[in-house]
Structure formats: structure tokens, C-alpha cells
Amino acid sequence: LLLVGPSGGGKTALLNMFTGSELSEPISKFTKNTLLSGDMNLPSNSGLLFQMNDKLIIIKDLAPILEMGKEHRGEILSDLRDAYDGLVSKSWGTGRNTRWEGKFGLIGAATNAIDRHWKVFSELGERFLRVNLKTDSKAQTAFAIEQVGSEEEEVKASLRRVGSEFLDHYKEAVSTTHPFVPDYLKSTISELGILVARLRTPVQRDRSKHVGTPPQPEVGTRLTKQLIKLATAAAVLYESPSVTKYGEYRLALRAALDCIPTN
């Protein structure tokens, strides 16, 4: 899930809430060897992927990844793509072969400058959702308390404690709560997924702006599953027995519309 919003809009403050939990794994720096390493001097399970199972991965700023050289950036995105699918298998010239299987959640944050790199995310295929944060002056003032004031550290610690309790509580809730998704909403979300998959298909153009290879849109199956999971998760959060048209579905609709590039 990508959270996109202006600088000072509360993205970092929001994500910082969850960094104190044992169920989260914040990552501040990425290299092509961060997730898995081919260094024979390190244990075979030394890569970060082996610490990420069943955790929420938090990347507070995606800009450094986007600004990397194409080769390194491509390798990182390739590893993330495979990791999303639950299996990463890599071989290095050092003779090491590494295999990882598992699952995790990931939330990353970026400013609207990410739109300049939107085609980069086509390398992740259909494996992401995007939410554009809506902030007003009141929200910005509330989050600004993290930056100023004599009680800054106390406030940060309090927010991290709340975030940790939140993750602990809902880890148990998701294993015992299974909100019902009506068939008509499954059908609606499926049609929405197919539409958005087409609308966010990258179009490759040459220097003269002529279309090169005809664009190949996603099938939309994975996107539909993600939107249904998002709506279902919202139902768990709201303690609702089922996904409703005017509640949880609207969150899925918002995320779907935010996935459509504007440039």
C-alpha cells in the first residue's frame, strides 16, 4: 500500500505510530542486497526477508529507491514483486543459492513527486494499491505536534504505544473475525478492478511521443482480490459483520480511483 501526500501532511507521523511494535519492521535504507544477500561470509538467512515474515513492513520514504540507478532499482522491485507472491529464489556468482517463502504486509510513503516515476511501478505489476492522503489545516496541526513542543518525545512514545496496541489487538481479531462480502459487492468490486487495471496500464512512448509497443493491461484479478481484502479489513476495523456498500466499499473505491495515474 502506497500512501501519497504533500510534505508535512502527516505521512511520517502516521507510520511512526507503528514502528514500536514487534509486529512491524521499519526500513530506512534499501540496497539491492537488503532483502537477500549473496555474501558467503554471512549466514544464509541474513537477509531482511527472513525477519519480515508475518510483519508489517514500513518504508517511510520511497524517494531513495526511486532515485536509484535503473539496475539497482529494478533488482529491488523484482525482489519485492517475488516476495509479494510468497517466494523468492536467488543465485549469486559467489555460489550461494537462497530461497525464501512467507508473507508480509507493506506500507510505503511518498510525496506527489512519485507521479514522475509512475511508470517505474509498472515493474511491480499489479501488486500495489495507492491512497492519496487528504489533509486539512486541522490535521496538519495535529500531526505537527510531533515536530514541536516540549513534550515531543512523550507524544511520540504515546503514539507508538497506541500503534503497538492497535496491531496487537487486530492481529487476534483477524484470526477470529470473517466479515461477509455480499455477492453483488464482489461483482461490483470485480468490475471496478478490471476497469482500474486498464486505466492504470502504462503506455510506452518514444522521444517523439509515438506509442511503441501496444499496451498490455493487467487482467485485474489480483487487483480485485486486493480491493476485496481492503474492504474486508475495514469491516474488521469497524467491527462490522459484513462489507457494506456505503461503508467499507467506499474505502475500496477510493483506493481504486487513487491508483489511476493523472499524467
Where are these regions (language model features)?
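Conserved ASCE/P-loop NTPase catalytic core
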Residues: 1-140
